[in-house]
Regions:
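Flexible, glycine/small-residue-enriched loop-and-beta-strand segment within the central core
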Residues: 1-63, 89-90, 94-102
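Short conserved catalytic/interaction loops centered on acidic-Pro-aromatic/His motifs
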Residues: 32, 65-67, 82-83
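Residue-level marker of beta-strand positions
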Residues: 16, 49-51, 67-69, 75, ...
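Beta-rich strand-turn-strand
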Residues: 54-78
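Acidic, glycine-centered active-site loop in nucleotide-sugar glycosyltransferases
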Residues: 81-82, 87-90
Length: 103
């Protein structure tokens, strides 16, 4: 199993984070019509206690706040609010993440 990391810009990965198999962290993207020229660049920040699940893609300039779970095959393109569960293309909050230890 592997993850793909395209780090032409800075990637900040917090403590206790998981980046699952086949997930992609992309700090730049291109377009075949521009003959390989970079279309978009930006750093990625993933704060503490996050989980980027299988096949998820994190696009340039994205910021995943503390405690977020990005569901399988989610597409992160922007900022996700802390302690939420986010899924979809683009990934949006579907609910609050509650830790059993906090109950």
């Amino acid at each position: 199993d592997c993850a793909v990391v395209n780090a032409t810009k800075k990637i900040v990965l917090g403590k206790r984070c998981v980046v699952s198999q086949y997930a992609m962290l992309m700090t730049s993207s291109g377009d075949i019509n521009t003959r390989g020229k970079t279309q978009r660049e930006g750093s990625i920040t993933i704060e503490d206690d996050c989980w980027v699940a299988t096949d998820a893609i994190v696009m340039p300039g994205s910021h995943i706040e503390q405690g977020v779970v990005v569901g399988a095959r989610g597409l992160v393109d922007g900022r996700l609010p802390k302690w939420t569960i986010c899924t979809g293309e683009p990934a949006v909050s579907r609910g609050e993440r509650v830790l059993y230890a906090q109950k």
